[in-house]
C-alpha cells in the first residue's frame, strides 16, 4: 500500500507536529458490531477523516496508515509508523465489550449487539514495550485530560477481572491502560497510543459518537492536547 501525506497552508499552531493517524480495522476485518448494526471500521474511518482535517487546519502534518478501502496488516501499520518520522502514532478505534455483557438483536433485519448494562466512555492504551513509553503516556494523559474537560468520562470495563479483559489501569480517573502486547503500539518506535473513542455496543454512547457535533468537540480536544503536551 502507499501511505499519503496531506497538509494545508494555514496559520501554524504554537508547535507543528507530524501525526500518524491509524484508522483501526479494515473492510475485510471490520471490528466490533454496534447497536445500530454499523461496524466499527465505519466509525473509525469517519473519525480519522474529520480529525485529519482538523489537524491540518491547525498547521499539523498528517500521515495515514491506510485509505478507507485499503487492506493492511498490523505489521505494515507499524512499519509505516517507523518510516514516517512522525511525532505521534494515534490509532483510532471504537469499543465493544465481552459477550457476557452483551445481547444480540436485529436492526432492520440486520444483526446487532448491545450492552445489557451501561458501558460508556473512552479509553486510551499504551504499551511499555514501546521504546518511547513515557512519551506515549504523556500524549495519552494530555488527550484524556482534554476529554475529561468536555465532561467525557472513561470506561473502566477493560480492568474487569474476566477473560479477555483484566487490563492494568495506569490512571482510573483518566482511563489510561497499559496493554503491552498490542502490536501497533509495541512495534512502533515513536510515541504510540490507541484511543477507543466510545463504546458502540452501548446505545447511548453509540448515539454520542455518531453525532457530528460531539465528534467535533472530541476532535478539538485532541488537537488542543497536542499543544498541551
Question: Where do the PLM segments sit?
Answer:
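Gly/Ser/Thr-rich beta-alpha loop segments that engage phosphate groups in nucleotides
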Residues: 26, 33, 200
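Boundary at the C-terminal end of the N-terminal hydrophobic targeting segment
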Residues: 9-13
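Glycine- and acidic-residue-enriched helix-capping/strand-helix junction motifs
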Residues: 31-46
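Short acidic/polar micro-motifs centered on Gly/Asp/Asn
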Residues: 22-28
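N-terminal export/membrane-targeting signals
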Residues: 1-3
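Active-site-proximal helix/loop segments of hydrolytic enzymes
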Residues: 14, 42-229
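Nucleotide donor/acceptor-binding cores
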Residues: 16-19
Amino acid at each position: 500500500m502507499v501511505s499519503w501525506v496531506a497538509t494545508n497552508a494555514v496559520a501554524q499552531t504554537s508547535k507543528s507536529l507530524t501525526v500518524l493517524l491509524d484508522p483501526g480495522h479494515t473492510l475485510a476485518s471490520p471490528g466490533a458490531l454496534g447497536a445500530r448494526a454499523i461496524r466499527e471500521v465505519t466509525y473509525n474511518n469517519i473519525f480519522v477523516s474529520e480529525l485529519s482535517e482538523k489537524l491540518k487546519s491547525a498547521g499539523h502534518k498528517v500521515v495515514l496508515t491506510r485509505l478507507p478501502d485499503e487492506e493492511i496488516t498490523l505489521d505494515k501499520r507499524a512499519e509505516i509508523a517507523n518510516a514516517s518520522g512522525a511525532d505521534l502514532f494515534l490509532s483510532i478505534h471504537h469499543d465493544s465489550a465481552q459477550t457476557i455483557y452483551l445481547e444480540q438483536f436485529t436492526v432492520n433485519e440486520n444483526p446487532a449487539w448491545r450492552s445489557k448494562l451501561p458501558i460508556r466512555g473512552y479509553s486510551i492504551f499504551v504499551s511499555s514495550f514501546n521504546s518511547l513509553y513515557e512519551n506515549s503516556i504523556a500524549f495519552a494523559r494530555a488527550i484524556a485530560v482534554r476529554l475529561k474537560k468536555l465532561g467525557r468520562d472513561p470506561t473502566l470495563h477493560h480492568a474487569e477481572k474476566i477473560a479477555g479483559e483484566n487490563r492494568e489501569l495506569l490512571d482510573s480517573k483518566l482511563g489510561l491502560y497499559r496493554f503491552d502486547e498490542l502490536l501497533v503500539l509495541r512495534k512502533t518506535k515513536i510515541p504510540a497510543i490507541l484511543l477507543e473513542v466510545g463504546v458502540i455496543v452501548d446505545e447511548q454512547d453509540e448515539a454520542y459518537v455518531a453525532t457530528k457535533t460531539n465528534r467535533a468537540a472530541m476532535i478539538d480536544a485532541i488537537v488542543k492536547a497536542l499543544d498541551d503536551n
